């Protein structure tokens, strides 16, 4: 697992102490600027969380009999979204408020890509869909190779 440090100033003594602490509990340390951190976290954390909230909200607004069956027959993907959507709403409200510029940038990129996928489905562009799905599958393989797959459990720190 990683710990990202975004130093406000270049106080080497402070950075050394912080790095030492996080390394002592088995984390790999990365240092990056706050702006870069915000963009990375927007894509890897904040947008997936927002998508989960949106999908679960959409499901909750379906007609009662459909909503009940969505819940009853939840597949793994939907259950993963409900896990995310079950997170602390106050914390996430604050995350989106504090990181709004990076979130809006990445959300714009995501919605453009989603619209492109919607168009491909509408036009039955199976070649584009397969190409897109294959390239995203490669990203998953890289994540697995790096040992970053699966859910985060603090008790797993340092385990592969």
Which residues fall in each region the model found?
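Internal alpha-helical scaffold of NAD(P)-dependent oxidoreductase catalytic cores
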Residues: 1-83
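Glycine-rich loops and low-complexity Gly/Arg-rich segments
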Residues: 27-30, 54-57, 109-111, 120-122, ...
């Amino acid at each position: 697992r990683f710990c990202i440090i975004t130093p406000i100033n270049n106080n080497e003594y402070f950075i050394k102490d912080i790095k030492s602490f996080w390394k002592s509990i088995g984390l790999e340390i990365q240092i990056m600027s706050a702006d870069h951190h915000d963009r990375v976290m927007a894509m890897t954390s904040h947008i997936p969380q927002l998508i989960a909230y949106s999908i679960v909200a959409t499901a909750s607004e379906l007609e009662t009999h459909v909503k009940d069956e969505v819940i009853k027959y939840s597949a793994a993907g939907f259950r993963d979204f409900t896990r995310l959507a079950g997170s602390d709403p106050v914390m996430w409200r604050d995350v989106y408020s504090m990181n709004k510029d990076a979130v809006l940038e990445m959300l714009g990129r995501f919605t453009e890509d989603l619209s492109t996928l919607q168009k491909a489905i509408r036009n039955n562009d199976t070649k584009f869909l397969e190409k897109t799905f294959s390239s995203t599958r490669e990203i998953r393989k890289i994540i697995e190779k790096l040992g970053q797959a699966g859910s985060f459990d603090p008790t797993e720190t340092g385990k592969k």
